[in-house]
Amino acid sequence: MNKTSVPSIDSIERQWFLVDAENQTLGRLATEVASVLRGKNKPSFTPHLDTGDFVVVVNADKIRVSGNKANQKLYRRHSGRPGGMKVETFQALQDRLPERIVEKAIKGMLPHNALGRQLFRKLKVYRGPEHPHSAQRPQTLQLNPAASSQ
């Protein structure tokens, strides 16, 4: 009988991937990036370990959503003070902080525990095409072609 092998922390090879978010649909991009952050694309995937890779997302300001979500989708945050609820539409947040839209979408697809917080630290999102991670020589991650159609 074969036994399930659990990879040791030292044996996990981490790669860097570059994702161009230009003209990508937000949810479709987020699911694929979350899967790579978790390491689900590797044969050594273990649910309780961080086996994933680093992901750099560029052109976050050019992400798109389908339908009328640009005007209807709302992002809420609360300061913790009475009356401290702030509500902002997708379009307003994209003009102000486009990185936050991508980060929030991907973070919601990661585990909601300490492992998810550790995985989220491996995500780097930038507004434009420039990023400071060229020393890591990130490979371009090809997303599903259906994600960029329409």
From Swiss-Prot:
Family: Belongs to the universal ribosomal protein uL13 family.
Organism phylogeny: Bacteria, Bacillati, Cyanobacteriota, Cyanophyceae, Synechococcales
Keywords of the record: Ribonucleoprotein, Ribosomal protein
Designated name of the protein: Large ribosomal subunit protein uL13
Keyword Ribonucleoprotein: yes
Listed Gene3D superfamilies: Ribosomal protein L13 (3.90.1180.10)
InterPro entries: Ribosomal_uL13, Ribosomal_uL13_bac-type, Ribosomal_uL13_CS, Ribosomal_uL13_sf
Subunit annotation: Part of the 50S ribosomal subunit.
Any one GO molecular function term: mRNA binding
Comp. bias intervals (Polar residues): 136-150
Function: This protein is one of the early assembly proteins of the 50S ribosomal subunit, although it is not seen to bind rRNA by itself. It is important during the early stages of 50S assembly.
Pfam families attached to this UniProt entry: Ribosomal_L13 (PF00572)
Biological-process GO terms, alphabetical: negative regulation of translation; translation
GO CC terms in record: cytosolic large ribosomal subunit
CDD domains: Ribosomal_L13
Matching PROSITE patterns: RIBOSOMAL_L13 (PS00783)
Stretches the record annotates as Disordered: 129-150
